[in-house]
Amino acid sequence: MRPNFDVSGDPRPRNGEGSRSEISAPSITPVLVAELLAEGERMPVYVHVIDHPDARVLVDTGLTELHPAVADMDPRLVPLSRQAGFDVGGIDVVINTHLHFDHCGGNHLFAGRPTYVQRRELDDARSLNDYTIRDWVDAPGVQYVPVDGELEVLPGVRLVPTPGHTPGSQVVVVETGGRPVVIAGDTAVFFGELDEPRTEGQRLVRALDPELVWLSHEHQPWRPQTDQHV
């Protein structure tokens, strides 16, 4: 991992915030990076920033340019590199929940940073036709860290495989002092898929007993209801 220290060895403040030593527990911030046309409606695309005492982590990277392969989805882009409040250089670690185009299209912005992805997902993205935009997967300088199964990336931040949306999908489980918070990518695209889980990945997310679950294509997090049963 590329530590974020200044020349004195002290952690650098981020965007007017205090130093990392002042952050008692990880916090999660959703960032809107695009809208896509899906089934006649505009669908948001979010990435998520984890501010951890040891590193700033970005979960998924959105997309930064148009491509003929997805022109029918009429992308409206708000790339991270053009957002005034977002410090591209301040990201230490990248995690891809999976490698569909709207989750890896900004990976090139973080060349040289460790980018964690399940090995199965990376293999599929590189070998299967019509899976993703391969030029975006292997953009110059992207440094993947292939993962096999569960992995603790930082204390209290771990990766959990959740096959379903793709065989190599994973979620990020963040311990915040109570029940965990999950950043789930497209393991569930809509709330209803967690209300009534059908895929192995969706059932695994519910089994984590999360306080809330951030999804890539919903404006608000999903929260379990007391009368729901897996």
Region locations from a protein language model:
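Zn-dependent metallo-beta-lactamase
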Residues: 1-58, 63-67, 201-212, 221-230
